[in-house]
Amino acid sequence: MKKTIFNSVAFGIIALAILGCKKETEAPQSTTGTATVEGYIKYNRNLRNDTLPDGSYALIREGIPTSVTLTFTLDSYDLDKNPDPSYNYDIIQKVVTVDASGHYSVTLPTPNSSNTIYGELLISDFEYNPIITSSQNTDSLAARVVVSGPSLPFSIYKGGKTILDHNF
């Protein structure tokens, strides 16, 4: 009887030790991928430099001021594999600036599938004094100009690169 109880207890301890061990689980896969949006935002600041030496016209644009912000907006509803219409999803916003040449680049989240999602780029307002030709044929500054940035739609997909340029 003692042997039977001892064997049962020993068997129970061994079974518990084997079944109680947990396998190390792998880290869960990311639920989102990424995509890159990049491009140039430019404007025509120097209205005098549009005439070439031979008298022909060529519009020459420059990068917008580096203080201008670019706000990229996505709806996180689009990132969910099985979105719940009754859930209030967050709006994702990423803000970047341009370099001196007007170039920007931003990495945004995408669904972890090949689905394309849509977003919006908003360029903040900025002001400048355009360079014009005076009556003495020299550079002079015109009155202040305020530029209001439009809202630009874009599309992205996992692993993709979207080029989005804009000229004022």
Q: Which role fits each region the language model picked out?
A:
Residues N46-Y89:
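Short, ordered, surface-exposed loop/turn motifs in non-cytosolic proteins
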